[in-house]
Amino acid sequence: DNPHYQPWRDRIEQELEAVDEAVILVGHSFGGSVVLKYLAEGSYQKPLRGLFLVSVPNWGPDGWAYEEFAVPHDVGLRLPASRIFLYHSRDDPEVPFAHLGYYEERLPAATARPIDGSEHSFLRGLPALVDDIKTLPR
């Protein structure tokens, strides 16, 4: 597999163009990093109710060092107004827990939820995420 950003970006944009109301976006792992980069580009101008990022890798030079998927250093200043939540297992076997710290620094208004355990995919669910979605204004 050799994924590239542009096809994923185009698909996200296509799906979001079809929605006329404020959306809640949930991005997991690679998908979360693509959604975050897309939003940071600034082309999405519709209301965003919430952004929920789960186990998102840092593609920057102090992470996995793959520039094509790296978000800008000032990503927190580029995002549409919205509540942002970050979730990451302390012992994630796929994406190191330190990647959460990277996003905490760049998204200071975000609420970080470190999760005890070694989940990456959260196959049994992520109750904290569900609870946080329920707190969003309608």
Residue spans of the language-model regions?
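Catalytic histidine neighborhood in serine/cysteine hydrolases
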Residues: 104-121
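Active-site nucleophile loop of the alpha/beta-hydrolase fold
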Residues: 1, 51-61
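Gly/Ala-rich beta-loop-alpha elbow adjacent to hydrolase catalytic centers
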Residues: 26-36
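Conserved alpha/beta-hydrolase "acid-adjacent" motif
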Residues: 93-99
